Amino acid sequence: MPTPKAFTLLGPTACGKTALALKIAETLPVEIISLDSALLYTGMDIGTAKPSASERAFVPHHLIDIITPVQTYSAARFVEDCTRLTGEITARGKCPLIVGGTMMYFRALTQGLNDLPEADACLRADLDEQKQMYGLDFLYRTLQKVDPETACRLKPNDSQRIGRALEVYYLTGRPMSAHLNGQPEHTLPFELYTAALIPEDRARLHENIALRFHLMLEQGFIGEVENLRRRYPGLTADSPAIRCVGYRQAWEHLDGATDRQTFIEKGIAATRQLAKRQLTWLRKTPLDCVADPFSDGTSGTRLIEAAKRFFGE
């Protein structure tokens, strides 16, 4: 049996990945595998710009609406699900198309997973108690002592990752940086073609981000977050689902921490920061094909032709 193939379309938020994926679907018999951690959650449709019902009816989508906002998902599970789906889609005679911008998942898929321990509920509760008693700064200073390399690359207010790094250290006796630096060689079980949309006009991307954020507000984004608060009492501002861009800022606004205008400004700024991080990842990622979505209108055609050649169509 021939080795399965998958075509990956990467890019920062608001650069037109979904629209291009649908154009590819008009040309090739694809099924889309979402590479977007925000699309995993049910009930989070507006703020994630989730593909519409008609778009999902036009072409099958996978790894969308598979967990609730109080459940968790990991890079390890993504690798497992993506590998399984690639085989299943290929067996159906279709072409797997991986689309998104969660670069941590893509890195796990292409470079392999580290042998890190599973989350430990008791230890996590202990760390949460320390944070409540002494503050997040105390945990960050502790991390600086036991794993300065990881502490250096994390922001002092990144509660989730600081807690995870300390958890790894306490469970294994080794800093997370040592685990990451000792990563073994990794081989993908399928052939992968990696294309990316990388806009050179940063101002145009920022304009798209602002326009999309305002459109989300018109579509009822605040109401969506209010519904999440009612439906899932266990959700907090630190929950992984609420850490998705826009949701954290909306949550703070509904808590009364910001007025509407400040919320909008912070939401747009957070989305711009996400795009900046995604572009930084992409510039470090080996790519088979790069196109500027805002150039001359031919970038989409070039990527569609690249996909057709890759799949032998």
Swiss-Prot record:
EC supergroup of this enzyme: transferase
Binding site for substrate: 13-18
Record site: Interaction with substrate tRNA: 102, 124
InterPro entries in the cross-refs: Dimethylallyltransferase, IPT, P-loop_NTPase
GO molecular function: ATP binding; tRNA dimethylallyltransferase activity
Assembly and oligomerization: Monomer.
Function, as annotated: Catalyzes the transfer of a dimethylallyl group onto the adenine at position 37 in tRNAs that read codons beginning with uridine, leading to the formation of N6-(dimethylallyl)adenosine (i(6)A).
PANTHER family: TRNA DIMETHYLALLYLTRANSFERASE
Name of the featured protein: tRNA dimethylallyltransferase
Source species of the chain: Neisseria gonorrhoeae (strain ATCC 700825 / FA 1090)
